[in-house]
Amino acid sequence: MSNNIVITGQGIISAIGVGKEAVLRSLCEGRTGIGTMKHLNSIHHELPVGEVNLSNDEMKTILGIDRSTEISRTALLGMIALQQAIDESGITTLRQVSTDKHIILISGTTVGGMDLTEQYFGSFDQDDSHIECMRQHDCGSNTELMANHFGLFDECTTISTACSSAANAIILAANLIKAGQADIVVAGGTEALSRFHLNGFNSLQILDKNVCRPFDDERMGLNLGEGAAFIVLEREDEARRRGADIYGYLTGYGNACDAFHQTASSENGDGAFMAMTTAIEMAGLHPEHIDYVNAHGTATPNNDLSESAALKRVFKNQMPPVSSTKCYTGHTTSASGSIEAVISLLAMKHGFVPANLGWKNPMPEGIIPSMGIENHEINHVLCNSFGFGGNDSSLIISRFAATDKENAPKSNIGDITVLAQVEITDESELEEIRNYVKPLEARRMGKIMKSSLLSSLKALEIAGIDTPDAIITATAWGCLDYSERLLKQLQEEGEALLKPTYFMQSTHNTIGSNIAIRLKCHGYNVTYTHGEKSLDWAIRDAKLLIQSGKYKTVLVGVHDEVTPMMRSLMERLGIKVMPSSFYSKAIVMSCGR
């Protein structure tokens, strides 16, 4: 049985078009989609964005959804991209003739339904007129909405690793297919602009007031964007058996953690280097075989310097054409990995390198990006997605199959065992954190950051493990306290002088990346955020890693908190809430050999 993973469908919606044909035209014409915001209700019109040129009502009409139905923009964008990918792949017809195929949806997002939450946040303590929208606040509920709209999927889950979310969704898809746990997986990401998102990034002072200039010495920061993209993945033999069109092969991928800082990359780009080299090795390639690199290239001073260093370490004096396409779409954060995967597929099929728009001035220590190449044969594309917290992932998309050296999960790894398990639910237990961190650092940490780190360190101590090979985190809500603080500040003080600490601590992968930074763990790192199923998926992924034979020990954790306000909202909605204000459980899993 072939282990080659092929791409049989693709869908995309972004600032440069709805559908791959429109996106292709914009790329070939060198036309950016970054401009003045039209749909986002923000005072910051001085900040250009990569906004999708459709209102929510227009998207509902396209999808056949009643305009009175309240649906997050994140879910709507995802549905449109999903519809395209599903139609192109023909899996609707396949489902009609073959009900035994196991089809999974994996979506990457960080914002979730924040656009609805921030719109009605001020009314929650007054009446119940809009609290139903809180059912869409969490990331997992948005994926469920998308899955239910199509009625094709047997399972779905959500990954949130900031800007690498969609890339990690694609990696999980491949691992599930190789393990025989899925026949077809539709994977990608979706993200909508929100005031929370825009002001959070603005508080970090990394937004440019002009169109961004990746890898330029005078770059001033990124432009936020929105959009969604999904690709359909399956085994090559199964795709050929059903007569599906094959648009490319996913031949390699790598997931590594920079383990350096919550919002900054290391000077030498260690995580990026490891992600790229792992992907190239998996594909059975050498660096000189890469014909184009779709860089993460955010145009922030830190990222472009760090990514340049990593690229130079990988390619040395044989640098292939490199460009960032965020100068077209804006930085679509959690959706960027899949949006840029589709762009890479288009570049490969049509034989061109997209121009790195706006670049003029070389960085002293940077790479020289491509200003566009026509008639350029591309057999292998390296596509980079690097997120906050050092969650770095790379994909290799190829015109033809790899050497097929990636085999099925190893059968001789031994039984998977739990070496240690630590649960923390009481606030008094958190005092123990002072045994592991300095008092000043402990005072700066919120409850969930303390409980997640403490439970993890204690579990590893019991297991006799200094550093695990991988860290997998499960959280339904993430650092809810900091998200709520930022929302309150937006409501009470408006869109000015927001605290960067609140935003930095609000992303779901903050928990897992904080543990990795503490342990200097550069291995696989991912966060699941799919409600009550988050832990099940985390454990499932841990088993996949161990069964692959490449990982011996995996630290799995489930960490959540609930604020008084959220408890009130959930109780009013009739949703079960955990009894304590926080809950942490850390599990150390091993193959036992």
What do these predicted ranges mean?
Residues 173-196:
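Short glycine/serine-rich loop segments
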